[in-house]
Regions:
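S-adenosyl-L-methionine
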Residues: 15, 21-68
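Short glycine-dipeptide loop
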Residues: 14-16, 92-98
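Glycine/threonine-rich flexible loop motifs
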Residues: 67-78
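Conserved SAM-binding loop of SAM-dependent methyltransferases across substrates and taxa
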Residues: 1-14
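Class I S-adenosylmethionine-dependent transferase superfamily signal
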Residues: 9, 48, 85-89, 116
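A short glycine-rich, Lys/Arg-flanked "PGG" loop and its adjoining helix->strand segment in the class I
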Residues: 77-95
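Short strand-turn motif at the edge of the Rossmann-like AdoMet-binding core
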Residues: 23, 63-64, 102-105, 128-129
């Protein structure tokens, strides 16, 4: 559901400054500032960077394209979103910060993992037990910028 990561992070880190961005409005979440807009718009990335006074501890990307039914095309498009979020993270995370992103298994999967390994010291791919077996959805967890 839209905002589920924000909801989770709000509950787990009560004293943190949290900002979410989505193309659509989401239900108000305690301790979360929500920005309606496209993350790929550089203006919005500047707004996000300026919202925080310092580099960040954690950046989470749950972005995905609207699915087309073509699983490989969807994986490629969502992979591009993940790479964009990873590049933003490299510029905005503290040296020991972490980046988590949704990714889909597909033709660009290895490229995304390699890209993350070039920028982070620790990289793991995680498929939640709650994810359906036939789902191509996974998460990449990256820690400590190189």
């Amino acid at each position: 559901a839209p905002g589920s990561w924000s909801q989770y992070l709000s509950e787990k880190s009560k004293n943190s400054k949290i900002l979410s961005i989505d193309l659509k409005d989401i239900e108000k979440i305690h301790n979360v500032t929500h920005l309606i807009g496209d993350f790929l718009d550089e203006k919005n990335q500047t707004i996000i960077s300026n919202f925080f006074e310092d580099k960040l501890d954690l950046i989470v990307s749950d972005m995905a394209v609207n699915t087309t039914g073509n699983k490989n095309l969807d994986a490629i498009s969502t992979g591009e979103l993940s790479i964009n979020a990873m590049e933003f993270s490299v510029r905005n995370l503290k040296k020991d910060g972490s980046f988590v992103s949704k990714i889909f298994m597909g033709s660009t999967f290895n490229e995304i993992v390699e890209n993350c390994k070039k920028n982070f010291k620790e990289v793991k791919v995680y498929k939640p037990p709650s994810s359906r077996k036939d789902s191509k959805e996974s998460f990449i967890i990256c820690k400590k910028i190189r």
